[in-house]
Curated annotation (Swiss-Prot):
UniProt biased composition (Polar residues): 12-27
Pathway annotation: Protein modification; protein ubiquitination
Its EC number(s): 5.6.2.4
Name of this chain's protein: F-box DNA helicase 1
Organism ancestry: Eukaryota, Metazoa, Chordata, Craniata, Vertebrata
Subcellular location: Nucleus; Chromosome
Keyword Isomerase: yes
Family of the protein in this entry: Belongs to the helicase family. UvrD subfamily.
SMART domains attached to this UniProt entry: FBOX
Gene: FBH1
Functional summary from the UniProt entry: 3'-5' DNA helicase and substrate-recognition component of the SCF(FBH1) E3 ubiquitin ligase complex that plays a key role in response to stalled/damaged replication forks. Involved in genome maintenance by acting as an anti-recombinogenic helicase and preventing extensive strand exchange during homologous recombination: promotes RAD51 filament dissolution from stalled forks, thereby inhibiting homologous recombination and preventing excessive recombination.
Main location: nucleus
Provenance organism: Gallus gallus
Length: 1012
């Protein structure tokens, strides 16, 4: 059935017609067919002169009258295709086009935006019809044989001769496709604009502007209509800071007193939302009746009745919207808002989904603007709304992405490698990547948050473009080996060092000139001259750093830019490297590098080339990786400038994949390639399949508060999760340093009941035997000889005959060797307990992770992995205390901490799948975003009599006459300490709840609305 503009007007005058088209599932149950007259009718006869003939939509309901076809009644409304407007050019970071005219008065702006809805007849709110089980999904219900009288048959033939029926699509308008053996009889193009608007409203705004608006002129007009999803457009325009959006939102904030100068600005937000124009068919009382089943309804009702009583007396929808807004503000998480939306989708509710989503976008816009204006309000509410809307707009892909066959290893650790990648259901973001075919010379960036399926995206990309040849390169050998198992045959998986070894490194191995370990200050000290100035060990450190910086750079020669800026003197004090010392460092480094490069060099003096050294030689040879159409660079955020130079010198296409917030190897010379390298195309993966909203919120808040990332938000799926103390599955303890790893291992191994532990990476890599050797070195020589304590490590054994433990400690301080200093600290702390602890840790340690009760490790070792439950140690960045505490140290500034430290914390948090136990410092960090784990409850539900405030050192008591009370939820920290939570007094709430406080405390009724 085709609908013209006249048909839509006629349809708007019919409740049955409008509701059948826009809400086909919400029809009143009846014995008859509620869609009678609306189902497409297949033509039985065509008359040449009747092209363009279409009857008024109301004529299809006049079943009692004989229909007469009059050719040429309607004009041909076919739309001529136009050249695409560059206004809709594809650029993910480009601002969303302005489709709404600027208005000086925000109230009129809101009214104009909803004029299209307010002047149309509202939708029906009847119950959905009964589904027939025997109906075929793709076709019509099986029709029973009917005996027709011959005279009736003749009448039907005459009607067929007289009535001209225009070709129409199938009953589903092509939305469900067709059987393989059927010829399509229609498509989505045949749907009326009213239905297309309802469909388009559910799509992400990026798809609307970068895909749908480019299909045809008709769709572009729909998307660009200022009456079409105005708040959704405004929200995304405000996020990218379009001037028009900034002005409009600022006007709204001023008109409704949503500013920092107004203590009750949150009430202004509610008043603003309550003014949203609503369809006349919406019955506010029926909607409120649907909401009564929600646990937040009674709290919102008490709040609005006491704070904004004038809204309750109005007969319009203002009170309804105020209740909904209060419920959103009181929501404890994403699921509260999802339940709210479910209540509003009940048959008794006459609100459309678009009405609800537009309201949520309105609230989200105002909340986001409040934080931008530094108004004290938690970021949790905005995050909950954004998360809920994101899942709704991407509803077809919110299920877990990869189905992995369970193995003993996968039960405790998942790293998303799977042989079932054919089961992958692509997200909108992933599909956009697959829609782009890489060309020669293109540089494509894929900015992928933690757990967003970047590997499976690359696998599907290679499968789609099977005619192309790809090279997948990474830094980790194990990752490359796993890649060979999951990528199709047109992908070659290598590490950068393996490529360099095949070309350069193998030559040095054959000559015995390959050193598989890194340069150390100790080894370099034997290759340099003992000159006046720095001590031999300190200069060995600065020269080794100069070489490492040169290896990581893209430069061809060693220069002073590669020398370190700081060094530690013999007293452990940081000093600037003088120009003279820089000159000496360059001279010594050049001499070592010249001897390293010689294949026939002096092996006895140990001028052996390192792995980074032959990688540097390979880079300087300007290699060309021929035979590939494109290169996948995994973990691109960890690329050094030398590797970047190799990649960018290729003529084929390049796809850089990684998470810029997981760069934790800058100390090795890595640069954040995803920020520094120019690109031709950029895509984002923001939805993680690893965790649910609770853990996703913590990760997103770290990026928000610590790194200022707000334009792209990390979200997860619908999985259950917890961050307040629950534990499920295998427990993993992640820390910043190996010192804490040893402490945790010692505590667990020292328990009476034997506990099986596994240190991620293994005991050898952890260096447990070196710790034992350092303890042996710390013992007097006669004691070592008496107890037959033999030092096995060659480096530590060298100090046995020289300066002993004191000399080793002095060396570690001078060369600033963090790992060695950490091991010495362990020995000094545990002293004589070291042999016992080492023995217990070794006996408790198991090789297989699946056999362990606890997994222990550093973030660097756990990068790329995921675990059921993660405990965050308290050795990360120390955030002193929450912002409401007057004793907080004022010198703590977020920006003073290195970015790598925040990245480490972000990586640690995003390893968790189900449960996350936070440190107290991490809880304090969330408090900087206004999140204190508070909940508003009815006083009657909480306590019957007045109770004391649960805050320590607070002596106030809650008043017994108040209707609402704020409760701090209990929380267990990763170190085992418990915050029991409890009810808070007014002054304590005011410190923590910020601008939300007026909603929770009701001192007096406001009989009249506030005049602005």
């Amino acid at each position: 059935m085709h609908l013209t503009a006249d048909d839509c007007e006629a349809l708007s005058r019919s409740t049955e017609g409008l509701s059948s088209l826009t809400q086909p599932l919400n029809q009143r149950r009846s014995r008859g067919d509620v869609n009678r007259g609306l189902q497409p009718t297949h033509r039985t006869r065509t008359q040449p002169g009747a092209q363009g003939r279409q009857k008024n939509i109301m004529d299809y309901f006049k079943v009692s009258q004989r229909q007469q076809a009059v050719a040429g009644r309607t004009k041909d409304i076919s739309i001529k295709e136009e050249v695409l407007d560059p206004f809709f050019a594809e650029d993910d970071e480009s601002s969303i086009s302005s489709v709404m005219e600027t208005s000086g008065d925000s109230s009129s702006f809101l009214e104009n935006e909803y004029m299209g809805n307010s002047r149309k007849r509202p939708l029906s709110s009847t119950a959905p019809g009964r589904l027939q089980i025997e109906n075929d999904l793709w076709g019509e219900p099986e029709k029973k044989a009917v005996v027709v009288h011959p005279e009736h048959s003749q009448i039907k033939q005459e009607l067929d001769d007289e009535i001209e029926i225009e070709p129409v699509p199938d009953s589903h308008y092509g939305l469900l496709g067709t059987r393989n053996w059927e010829v399509p009889q229609g498509s989505i193009e045949d749907l009326p604009d009213e239905v297309l608007r309802s469909i388009f409203a559910f799509l992400p705004v990026t798809d609307l502007y970068q895909s749908l608006s480019l299909v045809c002129r008709r769709w572009r007009i729909i998307v660009g209509d200022p009456w079409f999803i105005p708040w959704k457009k405004l929200y995304h325009q405000y996020l990218v800071k379009e001037d028009m959006a900034l002005r409009r939102v600022e006007q709204v904030l001023q008109d409704f007193a949503i500013t920092g100068q107004h203590k009750e600005c949150i009430l202004g937000l509610i008043r603003c939302v309550s003014t949203i124009p609503t369809s006349r068919n919406v019955d506010p009382s029926a909607v409120l009746q649907c909401l009564k089943g929600h646990h937040l309804f009674s709290r919102a009702e008490v709040c609005i009745t006491n704070k904004l009583p004038h809204l309750q007396s109005k007969t319009g929808p203002e009170y309804m919207w105020a209740i909904i807004t209060a419920m959103v503000l009181f929501s404890d998480g994403v699921r509260d808002i999802q339940r709210l939306m479910a209540c509003l989708q009940r048959p008794c509710s006459s609100l459309s989904i678009v009405d609800v989503t537009e309201t949520l976008y309105c609230i989200a816009t105002l909340l986001y603007a409040m934080r931008e204006k530094n108004i004290n309000i938690t970021n949790r509410i905005h995050y909950n709304i954004f998360y809920c809307l994101y899942l709704m707009e991407n509803a077809s892909v919110t299920a877990p992405q990869v189905v992995e066959e369970e193995t003993p290893s996968s039960r405790c650790r998942q790293d998303f490698w799977s042989s079932s990648l054919s089961e992958v259901k692509l997200t909108h973001e992933q599909q956009r990547i697959l829609n782009h075919k890489i060309e020669r010379g293109q540089i494509v960036k894929i900015m992928a948050f933690a757990g967003t399926g970047k590997t499976s995206t690359l696998v599907k990309y290679a499968e789609k473009f099977a005619d192309l040849s790809f090279l997948y390169v990474t830094f980790n050998k194990a990752v490359a080996e796993r890649g060979r198992l999951v990528f199709p045959r047109n992908v070659t998986c290598k590490t950068f060092h393996s490529l360099a070894f095949g070309s350069v490194g193998k030559l040095y191995k054959e000559k015995g000139k390959l050193n598989f370990s890194k340069l150390s200050a100790y080894s370099v000290s034997f290759l340099i001259q003992n000159r006046e100035g720095q001590s031999i060990f300190i200069r060995g450190k600065t020269v080794s750093q100069t070489l490492e910086n040169f290896f990581a750079s893209s430069d061809e020669e060693i220069c002073e830019e590669h020398t370190p800026v700081w060094f530690k003197n013999t007293h452990g004090e940081r000093k600037l490297v003088t120009p003279e010392e820089k000159r000496i460092n360059v001279e010594e480094a050049k001499e070592i590098w010249r001897n390293m490069k010689k294949l026939d060099g002096d092996v006895e003096r140990k001028y052996k080339i390192t792995c980074d050294g032959y990688l540097k030689l390979w880079q300087l040879s300007k290699p060309q990786l021929s035979g590939y159409d494109a290169i996948f660079v995994d973990e691109a955020q960890d690329c050094t400038p030398a590797i970047v130079d190799i990649v960018l010198s290729q003529t084929c296409g390049v796809i850089l994949v990684g998470d810029p917030h997981q760069q934790i190897y800058s100390f090795r010379g890595a640069v954040n390639t995803l920020y520094t390298v120019p690109h031709t195309h950029i895509y984002y993966l923001t939805q993680s399949f690893r965790f649910g909203p609770e853990i996703a919120y913590v990760g997103a808040t770290i990026l928000d508060v610590c790194k200022g990332i707000r334009n792209k938000t990390l979200v997860g799926g619908n999985q259950e999760g917890d961050v307040r103390g629950s534990m499920e599955g295998k427990i993993t303890m992640l820390s910043r340093s190996n010192f804490t790893v040893f402490e945790d291992a010692a505590k667990l191994a020292g328990r009476e009941r034997q506990i099986k532990i596994h240190i991620i990476g293994g005991l050898v890599r952890f260096g447990l035997s070196k710790i034992y050797d350092i303890w042996k070195l710390s013992q007097p020589a006669d004691e070592r000889e008496k107890a037959n304590l033999v030092i096995n490590d060659s480096f530590i054994k060298r100090w046995e005959e020289n300066e002993g433990f004191i000399g080793l400690k002095d060396y570690a301080t001078r060369v600033d060797d963090k790992e060695l200093e950490m091991k010495i600290r362990i020995v000094e702390k545990f002293k004589e307990r070291i042999p016992e602890l080492v023995q217990k840790i070794e006996s408790s340690h198991v090789l297989q992770e699946a056999m362990a009760d606890y997994l222990i490790g550093t973030v660097h070792q756990a990068k790329g992995l995921e675990f059921d439950t993660v405990l965050i140690a308290d050795d990360f960045v120390d955030v002193p205390c929450a912002r409401d505490n007057n004793q907080r140290r004022p010198q703590f500034i977020i920006g003073m901490c290195p970015e790598d430290e925040w990245n480490l914390l972000y990586v640690a948090v995003t390893r968790a799948k189900k449960c996350l136990l936070m440190s107290q410092s991490l809880e304090h960090l969330l408090a900087l975003a206004g999140e204190h784990f508070l909940r508003v409850e009815l006083m009657g539900e909480a306590v019957k009599t007045g109770v004391a405030c649960s805050t320590q050192q607070c002596t106030q008591t809650l008043q017994s006459g108040i209707r609402l009370v704020v409760k701090k939820l209990p929380l267990i920290h990763s170190n085992g300490s418990r915050d029991m939570g409890g009810y808070l007094c007014y002054s304590c709430v005011q410190k923590r709840f910020g601008s939300m406080t007026p909603l929770a405390f009701l001192p007096a009724l406001q009989e009249e609305p506030i005049v602005l």
